[in-house]
């Protein structure tokens, strides 16, 4: 999978990018990006460039970038696919917290253990929607 991170920029700068487009002032941009990286467990990697990060760490930078603008809807395609079990559990815990804060999370996964975290599960089988719960 590709996380569309800017290869020559730090994790922090990559997370700041959508805030830059939204014209958020520099100081607030930095604070919000640092908080997002902290939420995904990467506070100690803020100055690392993508080539200095593991695949799972790059995935978490992409998640931090997705949540930095405080979205009402988060679309996540295989958000734990490149993560080890511990990091995957941390991401699912973060998604649960975001949902508790009012963010709707629409997640696509092939992993039944990850799907078990969802309040509602809809499967596509042979081109048809099947609701499990």
Language-model features, listed with the residues they occupy:
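ABC family nucleotide-binding domain
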Residues: 1-125
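Conserved switch/coupling elements of ABC/ABC-like ATPase nucleotide-binding domains
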Residues: 126-132
């Amino acid at each position: 999978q590709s996380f569309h991170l800017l290869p020559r920029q730090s994790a922090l700068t990559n997370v700041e990018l959508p805030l830059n487009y939204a014209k958020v002032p520099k100081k607030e941009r930095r604070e919000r990006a640092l908080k997002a990286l902290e939420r995904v467990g990467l506070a100690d990697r803020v100055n690392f460039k993508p080539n200095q990060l593991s695949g799972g760490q790059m995935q978490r930078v992409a998640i931090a970038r997705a949540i930095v603008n405080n979205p009402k809807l988060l679309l996540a395609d295989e958000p734990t696919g490149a993560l080890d079990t511990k990091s995957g559990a941390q991401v699912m815990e973060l998604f649960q917290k975001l949902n508790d804060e009012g963010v709707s999370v629409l997640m696509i996964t092939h992993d039944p253990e990850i799907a078990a975290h969802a309040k509602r599960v809809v499967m596509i089988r042979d081109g048809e929607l099947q609701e499990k719960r």
